[in-house]
């Protein structure tokens, strides 16, 4: 804005003895030409080069970029796939889709509630809508997801970007409530992906095999290096188990001695914090503690029998969830573990976002403050094992 002009207008308004409406037209990026010319790029500002306005990118393929590539690939093979967003085509990675399939792309503007209901109608007409929205903004659509999607059991895929810790976007944009909000909703499947291959397989399942609505969530970060177990086929309710030998074969003491299970801890994580969990597991193995990882993949449904069969082989479980603890999946699984005869002996600990809003910061700062950094995971596991 022009500050001088606004001051003149406000001074005039003070002198008018009746109600006044001042229409202030915002020029996004005013005074900085790269921002004025690319307002969508500078909607959420991370590190960038001041001289030319070029925004820093992740060194590796990001989750958003992978989604962008995969949804275009799938749409080329199936003309029933359409994409819906709410004024965030670039941020969610749908800009490539919008250029490739102009007649199958719908930007409804800043109206997330309408985006969801609109997608339900599209689904009723026989198409497969993929709705891409940030986790924080999907909170506006809770009623529509319940009434217009889940209650009708519509085959709608909701792609939640910026799930979990969201760096640089402030406390209003954290994606920490979606699991607690949507886990109780009947008919709704929820998936949390851990990397590129995991996302690809889960998107294919959600679009091609799911019979009802599916929420798939991923973080604002680069995709971590893949490990072979994530190539496992998608089975509803089941996650991906990574044993110590999968990620630390040269230093593993897995299986040594008849009583070795008593040294073992299982780290159960949602996909968005797999990287931190993996670093913690490797650190624990270096300290002589066998630590396996169970990436949940499915938040809902959850195969209790399958999980109990895995969990009973361990001494303790640490849950790592990039969502609020109250109402989260970790809290529920911990309750199940304690009440099941097969697993009631297990020691457990839950690491999740506490009951307070999240301050602005980078990803490492946010996770450390919430107790979800790799160092905090290691400490929790050692405390559980009394080491």
Question: What are the roles of these predicted feature ranges?
Answer:
Residues 1-44, 51-99, 113-116, 138, ...:
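Thiamine diphosphate
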Residues 93, 105, 112-132, 141-145, ...:
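Extended, hydrophobic alpha-helical segments in both membrane/secreted and soluble proteins
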Residues 106, 189-191, 292, 349:
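Structural signal for short hydrophobic segments within the conserved structured cores
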Residues 249-261:
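A cross-taxon signal for low-complexity, glycine/charged-rich
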